[in-house]
């Protein structure tokens, strides 16, 4: 098994995660597909033969297969990928897979880069529109607030309409809005465009991890996810470095032009080179087009035993289910709060560093952006650390010869939980101008190192704990941490003015220190806690069922089963209470008589 960190929220479909747990992605209990014998060949109109190699990638070899079924409405042919299917993303050459991971990581980097690069032009925006520091900072907060809503919508839509279509349209619109922000004539229009760009452009935050899950099996996915997971943290760290110099020399409009250019180039590159990778969508469209070509009825094996699901139904679940799990499951709530605090602290740095280094040490706007170099180094160290952790976990899984427990994911979080307060206190109390500037920046290295270790390890822990509910768990975590990331920069200026640099910088350090026990407690008592959590216990039951019976279970199925069990327990408890109350009344009547 491999480490499977996911920085964004609803990124992996429940089907992908569930099927990974039993070691089979798309072929659960399905008969093998063999070439049709002559008597089973379909008769296809000659005028359609030229379409095979052009329309929808339907080749004659797809038709001439002996699929299970009879080709009728009652018993449709159940199609799956062929053994050497060129559209099966799992069979792509390794160099292509890594190239696609790199491109999607760049798209994610472009999105998160734009969230913080804006800070490099805040001084010019304040002068241009005559506004306060807090109003100008809304440009960061509203952009990050868009991360709360965007992935909740784009993740389910990518499962209905494919990864490629969703990425194409969302990043195209995000590029247009980013370019529009460069020409904004008022602060209101600038802030609205920033929010829309963050909401619509956040598709890669859910698309990229899903694309990795489409292409790599679980044994290979760890390294790919380690490579990708740096993008959501490197982007915000690099943004102020580039933005500070460009904003200082060319102005804030050119800075937004750079964001639009970065987004536009990655949009073109990903659109041109990355194919559709989501297997259920590919097979669903293939079945539809084969039905049109032959007059027979085809259906994807991945859709055969599932009721049809509309976009409205999936969006409703995507918008409501994460919040249900967030507030009903203690593990989800506590880990999400912890991740949100440290994630918000990272975005607080974009308002705090100008106070500490530009205002406190007299650095220029461009040089002030270089203070984020420590965070960049810390993120890189965490990625290297997780590459080694991935190998350690894989060795432990092989030597055990049995499924690993979710708590086995937590050692990096334990280490990271110690590094975060160490780094934050180090930074807070070495910000005096009399102390060399490199000393507080070294503190930010430890903070960023610990931040990514905790982030990735806790997300892995949640995925392994909830398995079939993982997509909704990731959505809940993503939404909450984005709210914290949007809120923290807004009160930073007042906090630093009221408390002073050292004590204001210590506030997030104390919060992180209060969270240190959580990874230790989950590591020691996590199993007992999970068994007392309704949905975690149901996820464990579903996982056991999939391993023993080799059946695929969807998130909807598991949610329905959990809700039925909850209703049954509630009914039984009410019935028991009513019976007990009636029994007491009977005894009282007897005594009265």
From Swiss-Prot:
Cellular component, GO annotation: plasma membrane
Induction: Expression is positively regulated by the secondary metabolism regulator LAE1.
Spans through the membrane: 98-118, 135-155, 167-187, 195-215, 227-247, 254-274, 337-357, 367-387, 410-430, 438-458, 468-488, 503-523
Region of interest called Disordered, as start-end residue ranges on this chain: 1-45, 570-593
UniProt membrane topology term: Multi-pass membrane protein
Documented applications: Fusaric acid is phytotoxic to plants such as cotton and banana. It has been shown to induce programmed cell death in plants. In addition to a mild toxicity to animals, fusaric acid exhibits acanthamoebicidal, antioomycete, and antimycobacterial activities.
Glycosylation sites: 19
Keyword match Transmembrane: yes
Sample GO molecular function, one term: transmembrane transporter activity
Major localization listed first in the record, in broad terms: membrane
Gene3D superfamilies cross-referenced by the UniProt entry: MFS general substrate transporter like domains
Keyword annotations of the record: Cell membrane, Glycoprotein, Membrane, Transmembrane, Transmembrane helix, Transport
Record-linked InterPro entries: MFS, MFS_dom, MFS_trans_sf
Name of the featured protein: Efflux pump FUB11
Species, as recorded: Gibberella moniliformis (strain M3125 / FGSC 7600) (Maize ear and stalk rot fungus)
């Amino acid at each position: 098994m491999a480490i499977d960190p996911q920085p964004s929220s609803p990124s992996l479909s429940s089907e992908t995660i569930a099927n990974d747990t039993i070691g089979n992605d798309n072929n659960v209990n399905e008969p093998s597909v063999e070439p049709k014998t002559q008597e089973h060949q379909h008769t296809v109109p000659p005028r359609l033969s030229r379409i095979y190699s052009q329309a929808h990638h339907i080749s004659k070899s797809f038709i001439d297969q002996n699929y299970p079924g009879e080709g009728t409405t009652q018993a449709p042919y159940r199609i799956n990928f062929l053994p050497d299917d060129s559209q099966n993303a799992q069979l792509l050459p390794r160099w292509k897979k890594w190239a696609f991971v790199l491109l999607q990581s760049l798209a994610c980097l472009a999105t998160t880069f734009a969230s913080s690069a804006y800070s490099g032009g805040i001084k010019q925006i304040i002068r241009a529109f005559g506004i306060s520091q807090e109003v100008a900072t809304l440009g960061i907060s509203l952009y990050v607030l868009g991360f709360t809503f965007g992935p909740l919508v784009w993740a389910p839509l990518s499962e209905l309409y494919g990864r490629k279509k969703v990425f194409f349209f969302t990043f195209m619109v995000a590029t247009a809005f980013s370019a529009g922000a460069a020409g904004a004539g008022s602060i209101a229009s600038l802030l609205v465009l920033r929010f829309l760009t963050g909401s619509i452009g956040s598709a890669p935050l859910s698309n990229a991890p899903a694309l990795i899950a489409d292409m790599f099996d679980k044994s290979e996915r760890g390294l790919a996810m380690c490579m990708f997971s740096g993008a959501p943290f490197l982007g915000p760290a690099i943004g102020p470095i580039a933005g500070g110099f460009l904003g200082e020399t060319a102005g804030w409009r050119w800075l937004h032009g750079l964001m639009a250019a970065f987004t536009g180039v990655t949009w073109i590159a990903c659109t041109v080179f990355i194919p559709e990778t989501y297997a259920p969508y590919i097979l669903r469209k293939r079945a539809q087009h084969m039905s049109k070509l032959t007059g027979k009825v085809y259906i994807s094996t991945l859709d055969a035993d599932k009721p049809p699901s509309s976009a409205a139904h999936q969006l409703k679940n995507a918008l409501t289910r994460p919040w249900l799990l967030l507030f009903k499951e203690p593990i989800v709530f506590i880990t999400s709060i912890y991740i949100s605090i440290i994630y918000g602290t990272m975005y607080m740095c974009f308002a705090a560093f100008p106070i500490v280094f530009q205002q406190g040490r007299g650095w220029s706007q461009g040089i002030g952006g270089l203070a984020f170099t420590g965070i960049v180094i810390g993120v890189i160290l965490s990625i290297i650390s997780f590459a080694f952790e991935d190998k350690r976990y894989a060795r432990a899984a092989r030597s055990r010869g049995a499924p690993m427990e979710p708590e086995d994911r937590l050692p990096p979080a334990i280490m990271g939980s110690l590094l975060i307060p160490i780094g934050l206190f180090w930074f807070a109390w070495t910000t005096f101008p009399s102390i060399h500037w490199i000393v507080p920046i070294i503190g930010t290295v430890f903070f960023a190192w610990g931040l990514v270790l905790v982030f990735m390890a806790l997300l892995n822990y949640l995925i392994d704990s909830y398995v079939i509910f993982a997509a909704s768990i990731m959505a809940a975590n993503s939404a909450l941490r984005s709210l914290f990331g949007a809120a923290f920069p807004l009160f930073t200026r007042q906090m630093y003015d009221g408390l002073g640099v050292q004590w204001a910088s210590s506030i997030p350090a104390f919060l992180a220190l209060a969270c240190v026990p959580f990874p230790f407690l989950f590591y020691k008592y996590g199993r007992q806690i999970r068994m007392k959590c309704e949905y975690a216990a149901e996820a464990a039951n579903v996982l056991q069922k999939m391993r023993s019976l080799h059946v695929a279970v969807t998130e909807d199925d598991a949610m329905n089963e959990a809700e039925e069990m909850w209703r049954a327990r509630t009914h039984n408890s009410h019935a028991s209470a009513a019976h007990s109350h009636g029994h007491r009344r009977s005894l009282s009547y007897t005594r009265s008589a």
